[in-house]
Amino acid sequence: GLHIAAVIDNRYIFGQSYDRVLADEINDVTLMFGNTTDEFKLVPGDDVDGWAKELFGSEKEAKEYLDICREAAKGDPKELKKQASICGFDINAKMSATVMATHGRKYYYYVFGPTIPGDNAGAFHSSDLWFEFETLMKCWRPFDGHHYDISRKMCNYWANFAKTGDPNGYDADGVPMPRM
């Protein structure tokens, strides 16, 4: 599988980020992080039960997860694979958020998943950057008005977070944006 790791130099990088989160060895600052819905999908093979057990590390947790997936799949094996598929970044982000919450750390977590027009690639890794920096017009994809609305709001969230440590605030028209 895909493995991404930092180069630990003990000058700037003192350990793998998730290990540092687990040990509560991160700076005491509010974080904002998230992922796109279609990046680095982990898709089970034909042995969905074995895949889930390996992923979760325990038969009990795998069964709990697959029970939910099977209910949503309604007996369709292809749909079960789809329901059981997960985003690798999503699971890591949610685990980090859970650990941070147990340590009393403040954070904001988002999931980015609008339909991205063009080649049906979904909300792929880094597709959120065009929106965060309001650079949709520099892309070849045929974005429409609602994409520009999403972009404006995302840029506002990030700007508010940079200014105040809290992404929540008002839109350009003075209307409060949905709270994160």
Regions found by a protein language model. Name each.
Residues G1-Y148:
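Substrate-gating cap/lid region and adjacent catalytic-acid/histidine neighborhood
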Residues A97, T164-M180:
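Mature extracytoplasmic/periplasmic domains
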Residues H147-Y170:
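Non-catalytic, well-ordered alpha-helical segments in soluble enzyme domains
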